[in-house]
Amino acid sequence: MLTIAKDQTQVNERIRAREIRVIGQDGEQIGVKQKREALEMAERVGLDLVVVAPNAKPPVARIMDYGKYKFEQQKKEKEMKKKQKVINVKEIRLSPTIEEHDFQTKLKNGRKFLNKGDKCKVSIRFRGRAITHKEIGQRVLEKFADECKDIATVEQRPKMEGRQMFIMLAPIAEK
């Protein structure tokens, strides 16, 4: 089910506090006023009274155009979303007895993922009695990490989890 975030901004009649610190439309501080008095001041200039700091004692309200304020808030949110980068984790599966050409193919794919900025989880699945030779799998993972050391850092050393051993590689951050 989709939840819709409701606007929690206190505006005009929705302000719950009796006394509020009022800031004028040009930014000058008017002082602590009763709610009714502050609302009348805002109505006289044809603007809204918007609480900008509800946790302050007393709450801080500013005389401004609420529509413009809401638009500015939405614009800031969009900018924040643009700056966020989604990091995907791509997985490459190897076997402890992988041949050299297959290893190079998997390595090429891993380097492609790392160059795109994705993290890379390289895992080895031990089948049957191969689990008795964990050191072979560890050598394969360390070789993979060594081949990628120019573009990636080891985020998590080789670790055993059930019948799988994996290593986590992260791309080197560009400055």
UniProtKB/Swiss-Prot annotation:
- Where is the major localization of this protein? cytoplasm
Q: Keyword set for this entry? A: Cytoplasm, Initiation factor, Protein biosynthesis
**Would the keyword Iron-sulfur be found if you checked this record's keyword annotation?**
no
Q: What are its GO cellular component terms? A: cytosol; membrane
Under the heading InterPro entries, the entry gives: T_IF-3_C_sf, T_IF-3_N_sf, Translation_initiation_fac3_CS, Translation_initiation_fac_3, Translation_initiation_fac_3_C, Translation_initiation_fac_3_N
Gene3D superfamilies referenced in this protein's UniProt entry, alphabetically: Translation initiation factor 3 (IF-3), C-terminal domain, Translation initiation factor 3 (IF-3), N-terminal domain
The transmembrane residues are: none
Family under the similarity heading:
Belongs to the IF-3 family.
Q: How does it assemble?
A: Monomer.
- Report the protein's function: IF-3 binds to the 30S ribosomal subunit and shifts the equilibrium between 70S ribosomes and their 50S and 30S subunits in favor of the free subunits, thus enhancing the availability of 30S subunits on which protein synthesis initiation begins.
Q: What is this protein called?
A: Translation initiation factor IF-3
- Native species: Staphylococcus carnosus (strain TM300)
